[in-house]
């Protein structure tokens, strides 16, 4: 995965984070995902950690279908990178 792909994923997460309909608890988890992807670490480790955070959000009862769809798009970007 190149830095361009990581930046693209970070931008997608930031775009979702700016949505006013998203609960604060989910926004905090999205911020953690951005921090993980910004770390100086092996790319595959960053991807796995980020996917784990996505799973936590998906299991959250506050997550509505729109947010789940956006998270699936981000997960797809991570898995295809």
Regions inferred by a protein language model and the residue ranges of each:
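Peripheral, non-catalytic segments of secretory and membrane proteins
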Residues: 1-81
């Amino acid at each position: 995965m190149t830095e361009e792909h990581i930046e693209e994923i970070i931008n997608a997460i930031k775009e979702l984070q700016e949505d006013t309909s998203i609960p604060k608890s989910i926004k905090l988890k999205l911020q953690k995902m951005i921090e993980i992807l910004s770390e100086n670490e092996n790319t595959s480790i960053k991807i796995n950690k980020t996917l784990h955070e996505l799973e936590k959000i998906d299991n959250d009862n506050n997550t509505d279908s729109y947010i789940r769809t956006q998270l699936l798009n981000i997960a797809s970007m991570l898995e295809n990178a």
